[in-house]
């Protein structure tokens, strides 16, 4: 209709002027866009106007669409970095001058989307918000349903405290071997659903 034609015309003008806009300004506008409730409609228009190809090297509209549906169904507020992780694997720091923190979060979400850590482990290793985002991005990229107990698992991981400290192992190991054993025991504890206590864990290496 006429409204869509006018929007496309405006977007075509924007595309032609992108080369004169600073990278930082592009990054700011992309963050605002990806946090907006009407993102999917805007992305469709941008793709029609071929704007996306001037900003991103890779993009996955199907994954983004899947993520937005998940957000609505689970009543989760939009998050620009989460949505960008579902949409593109590009290096956002070099391409759009995102901050180190933003680019790192995006990188972690992309990495964890292909790993097998569950929600509890992600929450333990990072934090509750990043764990939720990682599970949602993984679900959207792999087209799978998140587990029904995702929120309780995230809560469990966020309060879990690993019972072993380096000095607990100093009697048996030193140097790199100590670090390796500590990491081994930590993973064993995580795989027990955080149930093994200090004595049980130490018994496995004596």
Feature roles, as predicted:
Residues 4-5, 23, 78, 175-179, ...:
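Alpha-helix N-cap/helix-initiation sites
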Residues 137-206:
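Charged substrate- and nucleic-acid-binding regions of tRNA-handling and nucleotidyl-transfer enzymes
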Residues 2-4, 39-43, 51-55, 160, ...:
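Intrinsically disordered or highly flexible coil/loop and linker segments, enriched in small
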Residues 12-146:
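Conserved, hydrophobic alpha-helical core segments of structured domains
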Residues 5-8, 43, 60, 107, ...:
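Short, well-structured alpha-helical segments
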Residues 2-3, 18, 22, 98, ...:
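Short, surface-exposed helix-loop/turn micro-motifs enriched in polar/charged residues
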Residues 1-15:
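Non-catalytic interface/linker regions that flank or bridge core catalytic/transmembrane domains
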């Amino acid at each position: 209709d006429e409204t869509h034609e006018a929007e496309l015309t405006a977007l075509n003008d924007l595309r032609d002027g992108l080369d004169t806009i600073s990278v930082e300004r592009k990054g700011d506008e992309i963050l605002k866009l990806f946090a907006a409730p009407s993102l999917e409609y805007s992305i469709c228009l941008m793709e029609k106007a071929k704007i996306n190809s001037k900003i991103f090297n890779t993009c996955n509209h199907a994954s983004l669409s899947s993520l937005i549906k998940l957000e609505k169904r689970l009543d989760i507020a939009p998050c620009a970095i989460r949505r960008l992780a579902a949409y593109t694997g590009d290096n956002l720091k070099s391409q759009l001058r995102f901050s180190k923190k933003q680019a790192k979060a995006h990188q972690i979400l992309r990495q964890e989307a292909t790993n097998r850590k569950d929600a509890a482990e992600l929450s333990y290793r990072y934090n509750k918000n990043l764990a939720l985002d990682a599970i949602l991005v993984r679900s959207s990229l792999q087209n799978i349903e998140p587990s029904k107990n995702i929120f309780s698992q995230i809560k469990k991981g966020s309060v879990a405290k690993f019972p072993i400290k380096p000095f607990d192992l100093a009697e048996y190991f030193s140097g790199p071997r100590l670090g390796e054993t500590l990491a081994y025991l930590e993973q064993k504890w995580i795989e027990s659903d955080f149930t093994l206590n200090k004595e049980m864990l130490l018994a496995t290496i004596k």
